Each structure stands twice: as structure tokens, then as C-alpha cells.
Amino acid sequence: MDLRYLNEKRSGQDGFIRLSADRNDFVRGDGGPIRFWAVGTDAWKFSPEDMDRHCRWLAKLGVNLARLHVTVCNAREGASIMDVKADVIAGAHRFIKAAEENGLYVLISTYYPHFTLPQSWDVAGGGENAEGLLFIDEKVQQAYRHWTREFYTRMNPHTGLANKDDPTVAILQVHNEDSLFFWTAQRLTDPQREKLSQHFTKWLIKKHGSAQEAWDASGTGFKGKDQFDDVPTAGSAVCGSTI
């Protein structure tokens, strides 16, 4: 059975995917309804011929959305923090073309921080895991904006469009499996934990007026039992190893 006919002739042929009027569903560019049947893939690594074959196979199975995992930053030791991986961007460009021709839309995940932080990035805590840093470290935040801009604004030689202007690119995933409420926060290095403590203390003081007033407003349920017991005396909130 070949379900290719269920997909559009070319994805994005009617414009960008958008939300319905009630914001509960997706619709095509012409306003018609669309439901996504999706898979995740690393096919940007394939040869051009295999990309075409892969997308044709997915369309035959009834798939109309491919989630493409591409970590754009260059995390190899020796790279600058602003460096991007040109081969990854080039592979994504070619895959997007293959997807378009088979009626597949693309969801792109450009940042998956489960890698070792290169010393050459000159970020506090280098040599350790990168999880959580996007929420804490200003240098990583600035670099993230640069990586993302590079990926979405470079012209795709196969389509003549930048990714940001290509209706085949339906959904942008800004972050993948990373959070200060995720288990990886337990692996923050001491320098980054100190930065997090400083950020949190500034927020508490802005909200309550002082560290003491923040402490007074926090209730009594866990006082004497957690890592914030030193707020009144230290004047700061210390984020320990089990935040």
C-alpha cells in the first residue's frame, strides 16, 4: 500500500502551517485542516540519494512530518563558542528539499545540550556537561542566539530560501530535553551553580525587597530542612547539589 497520495504534492505549497482560529489545531496555509503523522530522523546525515529514498519511503507509509535533530553548535574541543557546523546546516538544507518534494513538513530541533562543554568555549565549568547552561550562562545564551540565527537565515541552495522563509519548515523547536527542573540540573558545575544562585537571589530581592524579606514571605513549612536556610544570614540563596 502506498499512502503518498495523502500528502500534498509539495509541502508548503499553500503557504505556512499556522494555528486554527481557536488555536486548538494546525491548518495549512490556505486554512484547510491538517493532522500530522510524525517521525524523528537523523537523515540529514544521509547521502542525497538516500535522503530522497528515505523521504519517499516515509511518505509511502503515510508520514507527513519529520522531526529533524540537528545540533548546530560546534562542540568539538578547539572550536570557538560562536562556531557552527557547516556540514550539519548543509545536510539539513538538502533534507528539507527532499522532504518538500515528498509532501513532508519538517520540525527542526537545533539544540540538544547533552554534550561535553569544550574548554575552548571559555565558559565556566568547561569540560563538564552542558545541560542547563542556556538558562544560566550569558555567554552561552548569546552564542545560542548566534547559532540559531545562522541556521535559519543562511540561504538554502536547493530551495533558494532561508529556512525561516521556507513553508516546508513547519515547526521550530527551540530547546530539547533540558530544564532546571529536569534531572540533569543535578550535574551543574560549581561555577554555574554559583551563577544560578546569584540570578535567583537577584530575583528574590527584586520581588521582595531583600533576602530577609524573601525569607519572611516563604512560609514555615520547610524552614530548618532545606538549602535555603542560610538566606537571612548569608544574604543570598545558595543552590546546592540537589536543586
Task: Give each language-model segment a name.
Residues 1-13:
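Non-catalytic propeptide/linker segments at domain boundaries
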Residues 10-243:
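Active-site mouth of glycoside hydrolases
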